[in-house]
Amino acid sequence: MSGGRSPMEEAYARLRQVAEQQQKRGGFGGGGLPGGPRGAGMGLAGLVLLGGAAFVAQNALFNVDGGHRAIKYRRTTGVSKEIYAEGTHFVIPWFETPVTYDVRAKPRNVASLTGTKDLQMVNITCRVLSRPDIAALPQIYRTLGTDYDERVLPSIVNEVLKSVVAQFNASQLITQREMVAKLVRENLSRRAARFNILLDDVSLTHLAFSPEFTAAVEAKQVAQQEAQRAAFVVDKARQEKQAMVVKAQGEARSAELIGDAIKKSKAYVELKKIENARFIAQQMQESGSKNRLLLDSEGLGLNVFEDREKN
């Protein structure tokens, strides 16, 4: 190809060059057609035929890219039932028109403002991953055209969201979000299947309540936390009171047992004398060498009970 011309232009130029050469020679060769106007007419006819053949060859093929499928619309019979896979295929120019569909899954976000069972307004966004049913492409083209997803998905997603959300309270949309998403997915898949649309994934990506409801929920949470804190303080005070009662009872019982032990035997008194003297000596040792004071047995408290015994 020279000068960036198309095959059709190149063939037309060659034919015109051949026709001019034949005209200069006075016809289409010895023993052929006579020259003159008749030869020029035949050259022009050949040029037209060759140009038409080049046009047909250039427009008789169409390609189907990866992830796509194609159908044909015929001027006589309408939409054909054949579905063409990826690759190059033959088509009759003017008589047949190829229609290509992208059959890969495409994401779409649909936002909806709807009301809950307890009449709270909620903004909810649903993300849908959809693709056409390949076997039903002719029917999709007849009923919906090539922009089938734009015609169908926004309306059915809004309808399903409103019907499902109306079954739950506002708080349940948060605590039972998985159940809500499951119901939306099941209902939406059934509705889309009626239009020959397959859904690979349906998820709730955004959930927002009105500012008033959000403030009320926060206030309720704060009140619950304060109530729990107050209950904890009361329970702690009750436990401390019980601990003090138990301690007092234990000390009273201990004093009673000590009194009985003293009455029965003097050995307990002697043991207390020794423990008291040991404690005093340890305290004096830890205080260091300064202000050292020497005490006898009376100062150490070893004679605590001697006067009582003498009396």
From Swiss-Prot:
Residues passing through the membrane, by range: 39-57
SUPFAM superfamilies named in the record: Band 7/SPFH domain (SSF117892)
Organism of provenance: Colletotrichum higginsianum (strain IMI 349063) (Crucifer anthracnose fungus)
GO cellular component: mitochondrial prohibitin complex; mitochondrion
Induction: Expressed in hyphae and highly induced during the necrotrophic stage of infection.
Record function comment: Prohibitin probably acts as a holdase/unfoldase for the stabilization of newly synthesized mitochondrial proteins. Involved in mitophagy. Required for the switch to necrotrophic growth.
Name under which the protein is recorded: Prohibitin-2
GO BP term, example: mitophagy
The protein's assembly and partners: The mitochondrial prohibitin complex consists of two subunits (PHB1 and PHB2). The subunits assemble into a membrane-associated ring-shaped supercomplex of approximately 1 mDa. Interacts with ATG24/SNX4; the interaction is direct and plays a role in mitophagy.
Subcellular location: Mitochondrion inner membrane
UniProt cross-references to SMART domains, sorted A to Z: PHB (SM00244)
Membrane topology, record value: Single-pass type II membrane protein
Stated family: Belongs to the prohibitin family.
UniProt motif (AIM) ranges: 141-144
Keywords noted in UniProt: Membrane, Mitochondrion, Mitochondrion inner membrane, Signal-anchor, Transmembrane, Transmembrane helix
Protein encoded by which gene: PHB2
Main location: mitochondrion
Disruption phenotype: Abrogates mitophagy. Defective morphogenesis of mitochondrial cristae; cells are sensitive to menadione (generates reactive oxygen species in the mitochondrion) and the mitochondrial membrane potential is affected. Decreases formation of secondary hyphae. Decreases colony growth and reduces conidial production. Decreases virulence on A.thaliana.
Key word tRNA-binding present: no
